[in-house]
Amino acid sequence: MRSWPGLFWLLTLALLADGGRRESQLRIGKAINIFLRYGYLGISMRVIPLNDNSEPDRWVFKEPTKNIYRNLSGLAESHEDTTPGIFHGDFHMEFCENRRQLFQAYFRDFSIERMDKPWEAFTGGWFPDNAAKKLGINTSFIQGDYSYVLVRVVRFRETGRLNAEIPVHQPLEPDVRSRMDQLQIGNITSAVRFMEDVGTHYVNSYTTGNSLYQVFVYSRKNYSMIKERIKSKGLNGLSKLDLYNYFAPWFAAHLGQIRSASANATVERWARRKLQYEYYVVKYVTLLKLHGNSTLLRSLDSLLGNDAILQLDLKSLKPIFREEPEKESWYHEVLDNNVKLWELNMPQSHPTR
């Protein structure tokens, strides 16, 4: 791989600062430029609460997008889960040794081709205080020597995906074809300008809906104990008493707030009211109360609307270069080096922050 001059970094920032004319729609096949908000994609994609507690707008996706192909609708399919009387989703928990694994777990269903750590496109710009607020925990518990369990209940609403590989001769939009012709092998400026004008990736699939989640914080010792117990017996193999005990305030170092991915105040109030658990004189709110409770899940089914992105698969623009392999190679070289530069310059890359 080639070494890159310092000028490339400045050039990239200067070129990418100009947004260009684009729409803003989450649609299959549309292209986006991940470098416009790399590390801060949650600003334009509703995936986790912003730090502003007051979020009246119910937008889901505000990232600029661009059509790259003509007549692609025939290759795309979508469906909605609306069957009454059942909960269209799942309940799951993830064990995280440290905060980086916690970030990774939250964005488990988000993939960006040619990125080894796609979650950093969303979390790379997080500092400890705003990361803690998004996750519903106190800042002291995201900086210390702790482990975590992420418990989440997800309600799927709409799913879209490409149902076939994009044909080699699928017609491109005229301006995309023009930009490809202007891309010069070995010319960094032309490659970065192409990314700015056309994009870096296209939407291959997505799922929208909403979720409730809660982060449980543990000392290393208690974390190892609960992880081994659940690993050996399985979640359904534990008694209800054991399950509640492991996720209780006397066993966990800290119980995070229950939050919704869309910061929906109505559903969060419902959770605080309906998911209270009382053990003698101790009262606390726990998402575990939903586990196996079909009545509560049915009530929650209608409350969790189509307000957030739950899964997203972004593919590189490789298909448009299939007849020009040398340009494809050059484009991907610039893309890969850009990713590495952004990763190195994000706050999460600096342990003192």
Curated annotation (Swiss-Prot):
Cellular component, GO annotation: extracellular space
Tissue occurrence: Restricted to specialized categories of follicle cells localized at the poles of the egg chamber.
Cellular localization per UniProt: Secreted
Record InterPro entries: MACPF (IPR020864)
A GO molecular-function descriptor: signaling receptor activator activity
Signal peptide per UniProt: 1-19
Gene Ontology terms: biological process: embryonic pattern specification; germ cell development; maternal determination of anterior/posterior axis, embryo; pole cell fate determination; positive regulation of apical constriction involved in ventral furrow formation; positive regulation of multicellular organism growth; pupariation; terminal region determination
Keyword Transit peptide in record: no
Record has Oxidoreductase as a keyword: no
Record's function text: Probable ligand that binds to the torso receptor. Implicated in a receptor tyrosine kinase signaling pathway that specifies terminal cell fate.
Descriptive protein name: Torso-like protein
Gene designation per UniProt: tsl
